[in-house]
Amino acid sequence: MEHLLGKYATTDDGCREGTAEFEIRRGIVEGPNLLCILGAPKEAGPGQEAYEAKCTQKSQVHLGTITFDLSAKPDSLKITLPETADWLTLYPCK
């Protein structure tokens, strides 16, 4: 998990506007209207990491698995949240 820590944006502009949209800290993923508390690691596919998670999105709480896909590109990662099947691409701030 240590290698994922940092600030991220949903656009590949290096967070030039001065504010990151997402931040991954030890045990926490925070973004717009989103706060996920990460728990125990779970089995994941090749190039992926997965964790049990409790995510609050707006006013709803979701329990499930948060998955990080690190295999797509070296300059980005993909993340999927509990209760969703869509992948969100995040780019590190520079």
Locate the predicted segments by residue:
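N-terminal helix-cap/turn-to-beta initiation motif at the start of protein domains
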Residues: 1-7, 24
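Beta-sheet ligand-binding and adhesion/scaffold domains
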Residues: 13-14, 52-94
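Residue-level detector of conserved, well-ordered beta-strand and adjacent loop positions
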Residues: 9, 30, 94
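N-terminal glycine/threonine-rich, aromatic-flanked beta-hairpin/loop signature
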Residues: 14-59
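Residue-level signal for mature regions of secreted extracellular proteins and peptides
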Residues: 8-9, 48, 86
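A short, structured loop/turn motif at beta-sheet edges
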Residues: 1, 41-46, 71-74, 94
